[in-house]
């Protein structure tokens, strides 16, 4: 996920979801 598009908290959750 792109940090600029998502808030810090959601960024971590989205990053994991997208990677997996």
From Swiss-Prot:
Keywords: Chloroplast, Photosynthesis, Photosystem I, Plastid, Thylakoid. Residues 9-20 have a biased composition (Basic and acidic residues). One of its GO terms (cellular component) is chloroplast thylakoid lumen. It is found in: Plastid, Chloroplast thylakoid lumen. Residues 1-20 are annotated as: Disordered. Probably participates in efficiency of electron transfer from plastocyanin to P700 (or cytochrome c553 in algae and cyanobacteria). This plastocyanin-docking protein contributes to the specific association of plastocyanin to PSI. This is Photosystem I reaction center subunit III. It comes from Zea mays (Maize). The lineage of its organism: Eukaryota, Viridiplantae, Streptophyta, Embryophyta, Tracheophyta. The gene is PSAF.
